[in-house]
A protein has these predicted regions:
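Short, contiguous, pocket-lining structural segments
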Residues: 19-23, 59, 142, 146
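Long, low-complexity, intrinsically disordered segments
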Residues: 182-188
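Amphipathic alpha-helical interface segments
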Residues: 29-34, 68-71, 84-181
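Acidic-glycine-rich active-site phosphate/pyrophosphate-binding loop
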Residues: 1-4, 28-49, 120-127
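Glycine/charged-rich beta-loop-alpha catalytic/anionic-binding loops adjacent to active sites
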Residues: 5-11, 45-53, 131-132
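Glycine/serine-rich anion-binding loops at beta->alpha junctions
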Residues: 21, 50-70
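Polybasic, low-complexity association/targeting segments
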Residues: 1-19
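C-terminal catalytic subdomain
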Residues: 65, 75-82
């Protein structure tokens, strides 16, 4: 059952690209069509600016950004942990993100796995051979494959057991974190 839902999301993203959605929109729309998130259809608007690595800037691949938005639609926070003690509330919020389990461990897998497959996470690098022919067919086919892979990855993470995937080790990250920073630990 789950495998067929993942495949439906992958194929939905491919079809979305053929219909004219940009890379980020393709991934998010495919997930919104197949997963109950409670978000209105208008939520897709948030993805538009991420196309072409943020408005054709060439930064983080729009398909990767779309996958992050899609996974966030399911696992993202809608409220912060509450505690009358401000320090305890901050520590609880940090544990929710950095801890084991922690939400950043889920999101961190997206760019790391895509980089493993494509060698980069930047749109301008992943599509470098088409910089002078942005609208050519080969470029579109390449991006469609990236979009499909990003949608499949997002769906795989969404349908995985949350406790397990939120306890995975961090991949590459800005602080080379492996575990919760000591300053975020309630004891630290």
């Amino acid at each position: 059952m789950t495998a067929s839902r993942i495949e439906s999301i992958r194929e939905g993203a491919r079809k979305n690209f053929s219909r004219g959605y940009n890379c980020a929109e393709c991934v998010l729309q495919a997930v919104l069509e197949h997963v109950e998130t409670g978000l209105p259809r208008e939520s897709l608007r948030m993805a538009t600016g991420f196309g072409g690595g943020v408005g054709l800037f060439g930064d983080t691949c729009g398909a990767i950004s779309g996958a992050v938005l899609a996974v966030g639609a399911v696992y993202g926070r809608s409220e912060l942990p509450q505690d009358e003690d401000r320090k305890a509330a901050m520590q609880a919020a940090a544990r929710q993100l950095y801890g084991r389990p922690g939400l950043y461990r889920i999101f961190n897998q997206i760019p790391n796995r895509m980089k493993e497959k494509y060698g980069h996470t930047l749109c301008r690098e992943i599509t470098s051979q088409w910089q002078d022919q942005w609208l050519c067919r080969d470029h579109a086919l390449h991006c469609r494959e990236i979009i499909s892979d990003a949608a499949e990855l997002a769906a795989t993470l969404i349908f995985a057991e949350q406790e397990k995937i939120s306890s995975e080790p961090f991949g590459a990250n800005v602080e080379n974190l492996k575990d919760l920073p000591a300053q975020c630990d309630a004891k630290g």
